């Protein structure tokens, strides 16, 4: 039985643990491999290197899941869109502005996604059998917003203005990305991914009406399309920053696991865990502190979610400056709590 899937089967004594960005810049062994390839996307498509860094945190920490090393922007890149990563800046994309851009997207695939599927197959062969392999994609709104902004981590005025003023074209682009995202996830499952995850990093910038149209509806379409082919493959969705709209999301989208950010109250996590497996939600900044603080914050989450359908994770990705020894301490602490499974403050 794959460890991370145990909560789906009603085994609530096991606390699966893995971390977003567990393969990344905080690991010295990752940096050593990363330095060998200048271009980040080339690194993502390098079967040998991407396999190696996917497995690094498993070898170091023994997490219950490996998440394939890739990026949410490989999808638009594979559709022929211009995507680049600048050091200390992040992703830079050709800005989507018109119907002509949409026509270009439809006729210019570059087939790079085949490399992602090769990586999954290779990792699957090398991954110890109890450990789950997670494939992933960016959710349509987040991928679309990167394309509309031309870069990330903005205030998203450009994206929101575009969808308000260009309803038909925005819907066409959304539907196109939704269809391609579902296909990408299906192909990852075909290649050996045990679990699939959708990252919607920028869902929290939308008001309720747009959240429904650009987050809930496309995610629902993707989940239903994937489940037609792989009905037993668990799907995790992470509509980061959704706030009160998390409740609407789990009511309307038939996901298996809801990943939540660190702003979600523990009482809400407990409540939602009766309807769906909940994943989260330690603040990544806690891992920059000391063992006592890590222990205190982690204990509160574990106690609140004791006996619930729960996967331990962070509220977002591991930060690059995170000390490796803190990740090790946190992982060991969760394991120890699991073993003792008591109310003591061990």
Swiss-Prot record:
It is found in: Cytoplasm. Keywords: Cytoplasm, Decarboxylase, Lyase, Porphyrin biosynthesis. SUPFAM superfamilies: UROD/MetE-like. Catalyzes the decarboxylation of four acetate groups of uroporphyrinogen-III to yield coproporphyrinogen-III. One of its GO terms (cellular component) is cytosol. Its main location: cytoplasm. This is Uroporphyrinogen decarboxylase. The keyword Lipid metabolism does not apply. Its EC number is 4.1.1.37. CDD domains: URO-D.
């Amino acid at each position: 039985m794959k460890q991370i899937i145990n909560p789906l089967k009603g085994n609530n004594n096991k606390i699966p643990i893995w971390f977003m960005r567990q393969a990344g810049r905080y690991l010295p062994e990752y940096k050593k491999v990363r330095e060998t390839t200048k271009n980040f996307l080339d690194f993502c498509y390098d079967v040998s290197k991407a396999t190696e860094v996917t497995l690094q945190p498993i070898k170091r920490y023994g997490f219950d899941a490996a998440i394939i090393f890739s990026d949410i922007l490989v999808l638009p890149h594979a559709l022929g869109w211009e995507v680049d990563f600048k050091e200390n800046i992040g992703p830079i994309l050709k800005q989507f502005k018109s119907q002509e851009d949409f026509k270009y997207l439809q006729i210019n695939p570059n087939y790079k996604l085949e490399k992602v599927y090769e990586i999954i197959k290779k990792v699957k062969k090398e991954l110890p059998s109890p450990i789950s392999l997670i494939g992933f994609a960016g959710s349509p709104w987040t991928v679309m917003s990167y394309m509309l902004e031309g870069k990330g981590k903005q205030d998203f005025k450009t994206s929101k203005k575009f969808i308000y003023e260009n309803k038909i074209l925005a819907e066409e682009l959304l539907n196109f990305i939704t269809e391609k995202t579902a296909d990408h996830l299906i192909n990852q499952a075909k290649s050996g991914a045990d679990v699939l995850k959708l990252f919607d990093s920028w869902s929290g910038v939308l008001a309720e009406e747009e959240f429904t149209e650009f987050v809930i509806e496309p995610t629902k379409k993707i989940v239903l399309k994937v489940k037609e082919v792989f009905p037993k493959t668990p799907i995790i969705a992470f509509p980061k920053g959704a706030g009160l709209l998390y409740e609407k999301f789990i009511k309307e989208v038939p996901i298996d696991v809801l990943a939540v950010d660190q702003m979600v109250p523990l009482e809400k996590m407990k409540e939602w865990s009766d309807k769906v497996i909940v994943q989260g939600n330690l603040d990544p900044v806690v891992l920059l502190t000391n063992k006592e603080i890590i222990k205190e914050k982690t204990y509160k989450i574990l106690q609140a979610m004791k006996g619930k359908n729960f996967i331990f994770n962070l509220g977002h990705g591991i930060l690059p400056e995170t000390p490796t020894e803190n990740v090790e301490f946190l992982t060991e602490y969760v394991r120890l709590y699991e073993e003792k499974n008591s109310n003591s403050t061990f």
